[in-house]
Amino acid sequence: MGIHISNLVKIYGSSTVVNQISFDVADGEFVTLLGPSGCGKTTTLRCIAGLELADGGTIEIDGVAVSDRSLGIHVGTHERNLGMVFQSYAIWPHMTVASNVAFPLQVQGATPKAAIDEAVRWALNIVGLDALAHRHPSELSGGQQQRVALARAIVGKPKVLLFDEPLSNLDARLRDRTRAEISRIQKELAIPAVYVTHDQAEALSMSDRVIVMSAGVTVEEGAPRDLYRRPSKRFTAEFIGAANFLAMTWDGLVWRTADGSAVDIPAEQQAVAGEKREAVLRCEVLRVEPADVVLDRMHIALRGTVRGLQYMGPHTEYAIEVADATIVAHSQAEFTVGNLVNVTFRPQDVHLLPANA
């Protein structure tokens, strides 16, 4: 039955850090709370875990109310049947891998030793650490320590998995591998999961659904592909990936940029004459061509001037002054500051934000 959160509120002093947040997580679904520091995502997670006392709203896990301030309900963390992986691994340095994983079952006191040993073997096999059961944390890599924390979170067959920025202490390459491992394990076990991060790549690659948060409220939620390609809010477009924005006005026939350049985009994105909107252009859909190149009819072209550049290895990142705005584009072609260029893109790659987004 997953997780149900309705009108969750958390207040610290005079600050409302979580303000009427509502969402559901279905069985087997992986939902990410994504947002900048201070947006309320970790506080929301801690309320789900029972580590914070909510000031309003309700939280249900597997159909059972675990938090409802109006009814005086606050079920303790140890009674919520959840597993949690923290930003810091939080594993005991004096215990072996097996002992760390067994610890949650041992403190419950009601599980026979043989059953604990079997559960530990199962959890370590799931995370691929069964051969390292007798090692101590000091003998493990950072990625292996994080897998110990994950094994400990799943050993009790929890109803819910919670992740509080678990990859932030890993290097980039190890982060990618561990990200894939967490996704595999969560899907294999079909446990509803809530994952907190400020990292857009983690949110997009791991999630069935992403909830974008800012200043304690939900800005927008949806499937990763939809939020990236067709966001309904400017904040989402800015926060998820690199985006360029162009002011557009509909003249009755075509959309025009601030300098009058025509941008002929699909009819379903048209509006009434005089309406002003913003167009979102992702860096990767833009091509940078010399100004004298003959253009095909499949692409829209805007004339611009290179104002800055940074060599990034696979590509060069160009800052190009176009239509009274500066846009960022990636290209393997070589230009210098001051070059006149054409920035080209396909009509279907333009996304017009709704009015007042």
Describe the residue ranges of each PLM region.
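Conserved ABC transporter NBD signature motif
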Residues: G57-R69
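Conserved A-loop
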Residues: K10, S22-V25
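Glycine/charge-rich catalytic "coupling/switch" loops of P-loop NTPases
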Residues: V254-G308, E334-A357
